[in-house]
C-alpha cells in the first residue's frame, strides 16, 4: 500500500504536469489567434460555405504590396493586378501533399465560375519554400500540376520571400529535409487591392471535404467578383 504522503506527491506532480501542458497549448493557440487576427473582423463569418475551409472575412485593408518573379522570369507586382480579383495562396515548390490540394481547389473553383468570370480572376501563388527559390523550381511545379499557363507562381530570393511571409503573417519554416512547414492560407483580394477573405486548406483527401473547400472558395470568389463592364 502506498504511503499517503507518497500518493499526495504523485497527485501533485500529475497536477503540475497537466497544468504545464495546458499552459503550453494555450500559449501556442493564443499566438496562432494573434497571428490570424491581423485583418479579421471581430466576428467570424457565419456563412457555412466559408467555414468549409475556415474562411473568415477581413477588414478590407489594402493587401501588402510586393514584387516577385513568375515562372516565366517576368517581374510581377501585386498592385499591378488591380482590376482583377486575386486569389493568393502560399505554395511550397517542393510539396507533394497539401499544396497540390490547395492548387487544385483554386483551379477548380475558378473553372466553376465560368469562362466570363475567369477573365476577371487572377490565381497567384507565392513560393512558400525559401530553400527552393529558383524560377526552374516554380516552373517545374506548375508543369507537373498542369498549371503552367493557368496561374502566376511567384518566387524570389529567400529574403524576398520571407518578407512576403511576414507581410501576410504566414508561418513558414523549412525542415531538415528541405520541406516547408507553412500555413496553407489562401487570400481573396478584391479589384481595388483590398483583403476580403482568407481560407485555410484542410489536410484531407476525403472527397466531401475537398468539395466543401471548393464550394467555400467559389462562394468567396463570387462575392468579390468584379462585374463585367
Task: Please state what every model-predicted region is.
Residues 1-65, 227-229:
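N-terminal targeting signals for export/organelle localization
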Amino acid at each position: 500500500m502506498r504511503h499517503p504522503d507518497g500518493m499526495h506527491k504523485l497527485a501533485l506532480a500529475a497536477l503540475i504536469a497537466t497544468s504545464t501542458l495546458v499552459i503550453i497549448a494555450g500559449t501556442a493557440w493564443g499566438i496562432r489567434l494573434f497571428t490570424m487576427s491581423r485583418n479579421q473582423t471581430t466576428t467570424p463569418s457565419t456563412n457555412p460555405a466559408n467555414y468549409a475551409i475556415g474562411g473568415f472575412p477581413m477588414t478590407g485593408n489594402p493587401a501588402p504590396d510586393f514584387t516577385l518573379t513568375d515562372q516565366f522570369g517576368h517581374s510581377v507586382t501585386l498592385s499591378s493586378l488591380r482590376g482583377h480579383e486575386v486569389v493568393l495562396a502560399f505554395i511550397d515548390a517542393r510539396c507533394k501533399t497539401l499544396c497540390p490540394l490547395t492548387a487544385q481547389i483554386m483551379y477548380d473553383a475558378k473553372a466553376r465560375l465560368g469562362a466570363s468570370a475567369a477573365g476577371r480572376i487572377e490565381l497567384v501563388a507565392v513560393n512558400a519554400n525559401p530553400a527552393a527559390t529558383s524560377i526552374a523550381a516554380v516552373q517545374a511545379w506548375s508543369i507537373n500540376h498542369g498549371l503552367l499557363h493557368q496561374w502566376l507562381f511567384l518566387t524570389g530570393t529567400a529574403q524576398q520571400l520571407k518578407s512576403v511571409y511576414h507581410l501576410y503573417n504566414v508561418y513558414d519554416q523549412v525542415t531538415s529535409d528541405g520541406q516547408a512547414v507553412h500555413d496553407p492560407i489562401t487570400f481573396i483580394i478584391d479589384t481595388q487591392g483590398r483583403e476580403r477573405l482568407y481560407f485555410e486548406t484542410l489536410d484531407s483527401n476525403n472527397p466531401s471535404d475537398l468539395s466543401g473547400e471548393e464550394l467555400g472558395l467559389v462562394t468567396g470568389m463570387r462575392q468579390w467578383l468584379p462585374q463585367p463592364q
